[in-house]
């Protein structure tokens, strides 16, 4: 009876090496396209859009592209503009990244920056500051 091996994702949940490599190629291509201003959309003019991450599906046919407008403003407008230009962007990515199939693209706001800011604010609260400033040696003496 043949064994069926199930591929496990890496510990970070990023997928296989191939998914990570292709995702990085797509990220570079998309960042280059957006930086060159090749997308002619009034809603994108005046916005600098960063592409911090691209996640590929296991079959490499879907690319989830995480974007963040510089300054974090107008995220909904930028996502809508990118979605309107999805066909053009998919074609440009296909020209720049050598794959058997051009991946379908979908755009999401990268919320990691907001989460990092939230954690930073928590660390600055008085209660946490008090805990951080507490002498670690005094805790050890109390435990003994």
UniProtKB/Swiss-Prot annotation:
Subcellular location: Cytoplasm
Top-level taxon of the source organism: Bacteria
Record GO biological process: maturation of SSU-rRNA; ribosome biogenesis
Keywords from the UniProt entry: Cytoplasm, Ribosome biogenesis
The keyword ATP-binding belongs to this UniProt entry's keyword annotation: no
CC terms in the record's Gene Ontology section: cytosol
Pfam families: RBFA
Gene3D superfamilies linked: 3.30.300.20
UniProt biased composition (Acidic residues): 134-144
Similarity comment: family membership: Belongs to the RbfA family.
NCBIfam families (UniProt xref): PRK00521.2-5, rbfA
PANTHER family for this protein: RIBOSOME-BINDING FACTOR A, CHLOROPLASTIC-RELATED (PTHR33515:SF1)
Function summary: One of several proteins that assist in the late maturation steps of the functional core of the 30S ribosomal subunit. Associates with free 30S ribosomal subunits (but not with 30S subunits that are part of 70S ribosomes or polysomes). Required for efficient processing of 16S rRNA. May interact with the 5'-terminal helix region of 16S rRNA.
Name of the protein in its database record: Ribosome-binding factor A
Source species of the chain: Bradyrhizobium diazoefficiens (strain JCM 10833 / BCRC 13528 / IAM 13628 / NBRC 14792 / USDA 110)
Gene that encodes it: rbfA
